[in-house]
């Protein structure tokens, strides 16, 4: 089991609406070949969004703060074939962040 917590910074201030966040999170899930069960997203006013995709393997959530040019992400996966390093790379590339600081928390 692997748990990734991270913050994407720089170049992500454009994530002001829920549609862009939802599409990007879906791309991450599909690229990592994870299995979506359901999803919920919310648009904040005047800008910013939050979302969670419930996975058969666990969950993927993200919270945008366009005013700070940051997105916080949380990906938990119970698949034995899951690579935290690959997941972090996919997240950084799909969100097109200048920097992705992340931590891998091993779960038993």
Regions found by a protein language model. Give the residues of each.
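Polybasic/polar functional segments that serve as interface/processing modules
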Residues: 1-61, 65-108
């Amino acid at each position: 089991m692997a748990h990734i917590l991270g913050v994407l910074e720089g170049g992500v201030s454009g994530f002001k609406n829920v549609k862009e966040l939802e599409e990007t999170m879906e791309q991450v899930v599909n690229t990592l070949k994870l299995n979506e069960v359901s999803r919920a997203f919310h648009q904040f006013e005047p800008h910013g969004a939050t979302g969670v995709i419930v996975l058969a393997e666990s969950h993927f959530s993200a919270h945008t703060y366009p005013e700070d040019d940051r997105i916080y992400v949380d990906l938990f996966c119970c698949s034995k074939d899951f690579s935290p390093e690959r997941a972090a790379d996919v997240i950084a590339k799909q969100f097109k962040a200048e920097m992705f600081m992340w931590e891998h928390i091993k779960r038993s």
